[in-house]
């Protein structure tokens, strides 16, 4: 089947609505919407929930941008895209909870198509979701990865292991020699066997995110915490900032294509701290995190 960008766009708009409704149901606070237009073509809807009952900040962004020529970040590893017009659309979200025992989560699903007259379109899907705990709970990690595995199974037994490994490899801070969190799923350049199959998988990932995340939020949101846990949470959020600004391809793509900076940087935590040569106390729950986030098979 020929790629249907309109069908993908409608799914993404509905997905943004659904996820915002689900997060509001857990938190009680409403999202504030900011619709924007991109001068060079396209626009989006940015939605932010701030200082809610559970979430310090949650941002759920839909964007649909198009242009006559590809940016350098995209053609660097896909030279065949040079000289083509393009459309890129997606939903991207990050949730930063108040409670340090509730992990931060990130999800993204996207579709890209590049066309020129007289040639077949070049298209692909990408996306995934990943979890960044501050305090490790095995049952949470197992639930997260089991949900990821189960949504992948209808698409093949090799899908989850392949995209789990890709996620582990991608969300890695080379300058720190550590993982950003416990991973999940990451896929990109997905265009085989056909459009319908790839679109169905992207939909499964988009819908699966809240199935994976919200039970963990419910389990941890009422746990008591103090200044020590909060300080550690803010310190570890620094890793999130470092990854997004130094390594993340999506951030670089957005900034290079003249995307909306406020929306691109919406993933940043509202508060964060750095501390020179910080070392957690031996045997403390904080010290245990470095071992917990090392790559392993959770299911």
From Swiss-Prot:
Catalytic activity line of the entry: coproporphyrinogen III + O2 + 2 H(+) = protoporphyrinogen IX + 2 CO2 + 2 H2O
Annotated site residues (Important for dimerization) in this chain: 175
Region annotation Important for dimerization: where it falls in the sequence: 240-275
Pathway involvement of the protein, from the record: Porphyrin-containing compound metabolism; protoporphyrin-IX biosynthesis; protoporphyrinogen-IX from coproporphyrinogen-III (O2 route): step 1/1
Keywords annotated in UniProt: Cytoplasm, Heme biosynthesis, Manganese, Metal-binding, Oxidoreductase, Porphyrin biosynthesis
Residues that hold substrate according to the record: 92, 108-110, 258-260
PROSITE patterns given in the database record: COPROGEN_OXIDASE
Annotated binding of Mn(2+), by residue: 96, 106, 145, 175
Documented EC number(s): 1.3.3.3
Compartment list: Cytoplasm
GO annotation terms (biological process): protoporphyrinogen IX biosynthetic process
Catalytic site positions: 106
Presence of keyword Transferase: no
Enzyme class: oxidoreductase
Cofactor(s) listed: Mn(2+)
Annotated Gene Ontology cellular component terms: cytoplasm
Pfam family, one: Coprogen_oxidas
Entries under NCBIfam families matching the protein: PRK05330.1 (NF003727)
HAMAP family given in the database record: Coprogen_oxidas
Function description: Involved in the heme biosynthesis. Catalyzes the aerobic oxidative decarboxylation of propionate groups of rings A and B of coproporphyrinogen-III to yield the vinyl groups in protoporphyrinogen-IX.
Quaternary structure, from the entry: Homodimer.
Protein family: Belongs to the aerobic coproporphyrinogen-III oxidase family.
Protein's name in the database: Oxygen-dependent coproporphyrinogen-III oxidase
Organism annotation: Escherichia coli O139:H28 (strain E24377A / ETEC)
Biological classification of the source: Bacteria, Pseudomonadati, Pseudomonadota, Gammaproteobacteria, Enterobacterales
């Amino acid at each position: 089947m020929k790629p249907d960008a309109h069908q993908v766009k409608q799914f993404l708009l509905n997905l943004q609505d659904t996820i915002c409704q689900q997060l509001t149901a857990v938190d009680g606070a409403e999202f504030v919407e900011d619709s924007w237009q991109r001068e060079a073509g396209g626009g989006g809807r940015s939605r932010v929930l701030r200082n809610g009952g559970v979430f310090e900040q949650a941002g759920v962004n839909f964007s649909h941008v198009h242009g006559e020529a590809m940016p350098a970040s995209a053609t660097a590893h896909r030279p065949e895209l040079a000289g083509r017009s393009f459309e890129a659309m997606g939903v991207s979200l990050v949730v930063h909870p108040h409670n340090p025992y509730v992990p931060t989560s990130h999800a993204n699903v996207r579709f890209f198509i590049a066309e020129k007259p007289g040639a077949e379109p070049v298209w692909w899907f990408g996306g995934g979701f990943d979890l960044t705990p501050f305090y490790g709970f095995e049952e949470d990690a197992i639930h997260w990865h089991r949900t990821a595995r189960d949504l992948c199974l209808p698409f093949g037994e090799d899908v989850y292991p392949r995209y789990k490994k890709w996620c582990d490899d991608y969300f890695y801070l080379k300058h720190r020699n550590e993982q950003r969190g416990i991973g999940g799923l990451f896929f990109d350049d997905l265009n085989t066997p056909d459009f319908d199959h790839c679109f169905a998988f992207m939909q499964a990932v988009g819908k699966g995110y809240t199935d994976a995340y919200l039970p963990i939020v419910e389990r941890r949101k009422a746990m008591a915490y103090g200044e020590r846990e909060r300080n550690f949470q803010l310190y570890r959020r620094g890793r999130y900032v470092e990854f997004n600004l130094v390594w993340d391809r999506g951030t670089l793509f957005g900034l290079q294509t003249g995307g909306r900076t406020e929306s691109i940087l919406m993933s940043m935590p509202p508060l964060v701290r750095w501390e020179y040569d910080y070392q957690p106390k031996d045997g403390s729950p904080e010290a245990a995190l470095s071992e917990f986030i090392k790559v392993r098979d959770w299911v």
